[in-house]
Amino acid sequence: MHTNLLLENLIQGALQEIGKLGLCSELNCQYRRTYARLKIFAEKRNIDSYSSALIRSFLEDIEQKYIAGAIGSSRRTHLRRASLLLRDYVENEAIEWKTYVVNPKPMPTSQEFLLLYSRFIDNLTFYGRSENTIQSSRNLVRQFLLFLEDNGCSTLSMVSLNMVPSFFQHLLATYNSTSIRTVASHIRSFLRFAEGGERLLPLVPSRCVRSKTIIPILSYKEHDALKSVLKTRKVPLRDKAIILLALRTGLRAVDIVGMKLEDIDWVNDTISIIQSKTGKPFKIPLTADVGNVLSSYILNERPKTENPCVFLRSLAPFRPLSGHSACYALVRKSFYQAGIRLGNERKGIHVIRHSAASRMLSKGVPVTTISSMLGHSNKTSTDIYLSTDAESMRGCAIDLAEIPMNCGGLR
């Protein structure tokens, strides 16, 4: 931690560290203006040294101005970020570009619940559960423990038998019935892990509704329009490569943005990945069109950086893309440029992934092969793609002419 807490010196040091992040000149100017604003705020209070109380007071002033409508949401976010970056610089003598949570989610206050919660999450990490699984467990188990606390419990031994069903009934106000299935799975895992949780296990719903809706895919017209726009310069090389990968392989967004440069075998025309959801290694063919766009992106458009990930932000700091949100944005933009799905229709990598699976099926690719490419640990999960294959479904239809009828026809 810095020992010289003179505000002017700390601000100059923080600005130098921010300058090393490679941000655009306009953003660097914004930080200088923000810190000038902080200095004026401090001078009006006869303060010339940094303190956590000064930052808290400045953040409170920002919040009051935001509530009063004096500043907008983006301005509020930037002012908060600049303040918290300065705090990190003072405490760590360095600045790391990261996301700051404006309103942290409430946590249980019971010491036993907090200990159980942290041990359970550590256990998931130890056994190599995916980041998505761990994040879901964090959220759902936290909600469960908060619900128990709201009902007067501070230990699992205090939980009455009606509280677990009441928790799931409570969730129906915000979760649909299909999502309850996921919640039940995470709570069941937590209770199996927690000492004293076995008593409550039978109370977790075991039979939950599972949706079997017909999944959305691109029509042939939409598919052709998307392929056409990908051949133009309207779409950046990075976005072309991501969309083509999804179209050709059906990979999940998280697996695409997690690809490393070393995963690509240019000699044998393959890509080797560890699937995020299953944790299993998988090798897919690198087709000529995907390979050409990938190589063009890496050689001509990708930022020059030591980061091992293939797909990076186009603006500094050059970090990997942030999974679903980044992919959704670039797919939506490409759909717009192709003139498709301009309304409320489903968009994003998931639609392209569904479309890839459906087209593989229509070309006679075995369901087991498709299941492996999609990363389904349960092979029956791929059966839903049969609902998008119109020709195969027609082949399953019963010819009513073969059924004897006692009346003139269907009524």
Could you describe each region identified by the protein language model?
Residues 264-266, 336, 344-345, 365-384, ...:
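Short, polar N-cap/turn motifs at the start of nucleic acid-interacting alpha helices
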Residues 284, 329-372:
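Short, basic (Lys/Arg/His-rich) helix/loop patches that form interaction surfaces
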Residues 224-253:
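Basic, Lys/Arg- and aromatic-enriched nucleic-acid-binding interface segment
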Residues 401-411:
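C-terminal secondary-structure termini that scaffold catalytic or DNA-interacting sites
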Residues 278-295, 308-332:
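C-terminal catalytic core of Y-nucleophile DNA break-rejoin enzymes
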Residues 217, 275, 374-399:
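Catalytic-site neighborhood detector that most strongly recognizes the C-terminal catalytic loop/helix
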